[in-house]
């Protein structure tokens, strides 16, 4: 999408997810939401990027409801994306506001998808979800592996510790 439209040039048929008017750049493409769900459900997406409240060591994804009584649950198309995309990448902060890891042994929030996450991008590391467990691909400068493992609280292994097949 392009920049916000000039005052008076808004086209309210062209809005973003926050219902704000947007512009498009040359070559942009968009289509009806029914077509987007057909693409998701038909397995036509190579990958998608989603946010998350929690990701389990098995790659389970919880991203639509924390169970908080004042929160309005909002699945949207996340379940379709989580199951329909060939690879699911998650982008999230590594820790909650209270300092707990969002990467958990088992999700405690309602699941969006089971064993669907391929890779986790956080503010501290890049972690692949593999059949052998969580594999740390990259860590931010200044943070050691042992400290990352302590903060995460679930078993991690370095990418260079792969078991030979």
Which role does the model predict for each range below?
Residues 5-165:
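Conserved phosphate- and dinucleotide-binding cores of soluble alpha/beta proteins
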Residues 1-2:
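Contiguous alpha-helical scaffold segments within structured protein domains
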């Amino acid at each position: 999408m392009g920049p916000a439209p000039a005052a008076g040039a808004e086209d309210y048929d062209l809005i973003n997810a926050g219902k704000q008017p947007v512009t498009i750049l040359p070559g942009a493409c968009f289509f009806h939401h029914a077509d987007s769900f057909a693409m998701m459900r038909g397995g036509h997406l190579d990958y998608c990027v989603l946010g998350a409240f929690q990701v389990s060591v098995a790659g389970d994804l919880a991203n639509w409801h924390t169970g908080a009584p004042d929160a309005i649950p909002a699945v949207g198309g996340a379940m379709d994306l989580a199951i329909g995309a060939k690879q699911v990448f998650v982008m999230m902060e590594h820790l909650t506001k209270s300092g707990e890891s969002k990467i958990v042994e088992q999700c405690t929030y309602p699941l969006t998808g089971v064993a669907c996450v391929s890779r986790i991008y956080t503010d501290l590391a890049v972690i692949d979800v593999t059949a052998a467990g969580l594999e740390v691909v990259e860590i931010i400068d200044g943070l050691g592996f042992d400290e990352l493992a302590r903060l995460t609280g679930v078993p991690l292994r370095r990418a260079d510790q792969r078991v030979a097949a």
